[in-house]
């Protein structure tokens, strides 16, 4: 298992980037906010790393549950909130390259990334400004898995902000 860090910032805007660091604190990638036609404004991020460009964002037109558009070097894949579990915790699933992907919050509020039932990565959000990523050594060499894992941290942040807002609104009415 290899360890990486996402060094987040308070407010990420189009001109500012977040770095992804390896165990020796070397920059292995950068993440920026971006816009992609067909995605909700403010919900799309791009990961760049030596010849790899991946974007992940929330598709326009959702009511309650999100559909995620993941693009990597010209290919596009769709992931969706798991309608049963997403009401209770962050849970995204989909099929990429004929493999079933599950990205799911565990009891420790960490995100487990599984491919065909095998856990390949763990996102450990810190309370503030970043996350630690633990990724299977072999899996870390696959641009699709590595970039999607890094970008999913930002979808988790959006999910948490939105659920906090919904909880606040519900408290007003109860």
Regions found by a protein language model. Give the residues of each.
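Low-complexity or membrane-interfacial segments used for flexible interactions
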Residues: 1-42, 51, 76, 88-174
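Helix-adjacent hinge/juxtasegments
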Residues: 62-92
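Periodic aromatic/glycine/histidine/acidic cluster detector
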Residues: 29-32, 55-58, 79-81
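Short, well-structured hydrophobic secondary-structure segments
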Residues: 38-72
